[in-house]
Amino acid sequence: MCTASRPRIAVIVVAAGSGTRLGAGSPKAFVTLGGRTLLERSLHAVRCMREPAQVVVVAPEERLAEAAALGEAGFGAAVDVVAGGETRQGSVAAGLGALREGVEIVLVHDAARALTPAAQFDAVVAAVDAGGAGVVPGLPVSDTIKRVGADGEVRETVDRSVLSAVQTPQGFPRDQLVAAYAAATTDETDDAELAAAAGHPVTVIPGDARAFKITTPWDLRRAEELLAGLAAPRIGFGTDTHAFDPSAELWLAGLRWEGEPGLAGHSDGDVVAHAIVDALLSAARLGDIGGVFGTGDPRFSGAHGEVFLTETRRLVEEEGFRIGNVSAQIVGNRPKFAPRRAEAETLLSRVLGAPVSVSATTTDGLGLTGRGEGVAVFATALLLAP
């Protein structure tokens, strides 16, 4: 969620289109898909971006209040809303006029690309940062493309190896996009064309098949079918075991336990957090904690369990799920967990935005935990469609 008062990134979400080809009788961004409008679904991805962003929604003038309410519902916080222009280009120009001081990178996104994952937004930002120029996501063209005359006669077969079907969000350094719009003398089909016409380089990076534009009734049915595949609840299981390390501090269930021996590990050794992460990743079919947060990544050396849980929640939500509930059971002789159970459950529930229950037991002296050599945790997680 965007919480920074002066974010360096802004996302302009264009939601002013009439939706004539969709035939829904209302502007396209306000059409419902699986119980939520296209605008809400588009903003959900923005909410899951790694870095906070200012959000500017460009909507029809007569629906600004509705756009503000839907924007807050989808983004989870208030968004800036401005009236659109006569054309898409005019609408984006209106959005540019609402950018706050301090914004350095601008992403322009079509609300009609409602299933675009947050990872695509993050990839565009990273590419703009790396290259200092415009970036658009695109997919290879798989169909054979013919150039035809007005009479329908084929004039040429275009080499599809040099073609890319571009998507949004399209990202640019703010100064370049503002300059391109100021210099525009004709309406172009997208922002990348405007930037290129103004002499600014634009690079294509790999896009995502889910970022297709919902323009026709067939597109809407396709999106509904994709969402239907996410509708069934997902259950994941995770486990983790760490040996005691008397030289380390003990972190367990997000809490520091003074006077107790710590657990060995690349991070803080919080086995409760790690088992929950594995359960969530398993339910979302995202792999496991080792594959996602490998021990070779210095960003997570010594990191607390809350860091892993926060990022895992973001990844799960990026895939289109919400966390239903989580249950974890600690197996070990120490520490005595019952006195701090409520404290741990409150912290974990806050981090994950869902109910978390934690219980504890022993193995009556059997095995590694029974001998007092370490702690094991088993966790289950339930994921639901948003």
From Swiss-Prot:
Keywords, ordered alphabetically: Isoprene biosynthesis, Lyase, Metal-binding, Multifunctional enzyme, Nucleotidyltransferase, Transferase
Pathway of action: Isoprenoid biosynthesis; isopentenyl diphosphate biosynthesis via DXP pathway; isopentenyl diphosphate from 1-deoxy-D-xylulose 5-phosphate: step 2/6; Isoprenoid biosynthesis; isopentenyl diphosphate biosynthesis via DXP pathway; isopentenyl diphosphate from 1-deoxy-D-xylulose 5-phosphate: step 4/6
Record keyword Transferase present: yes
Annotated site, Positions MEP for the nucleophilic attack, chain positions: R160, K213
Required cofactor names: a divalent metal cation
Name of the molecule in the record: Bifunctional enzyme IspD/IspF
General function of this protein: Bifunctional enzyme that catalyzes the formation of 4-diphosphocytidyl-2-C-methyl-D-erythritol from CTP and 2-C-methyl-D-erythritol 4-phosphate (MEP) (IspD), and catalyzes the conversion of 4-diphosphocytidyl-2-C-methyl-D-erythritol 2-phosphate (CDP-ME2P) to 2-C-methyl-D-erythritol 2,4-cyclodiphosphate (ME-CPP) with a corresponding release of cytidine 5-monophosphate (CMP) (IspF).
Cited HAMAP family: IspD, IspDF, IspF
Family: In the N-terminal section; belongs to the IspD/TarI cytidylyltransferase family. IspD subfamily. In the C-terminal section; belongs to the IspF family.
Native species: Leifsonia xyli subsp. xyli (strain CTCB07)
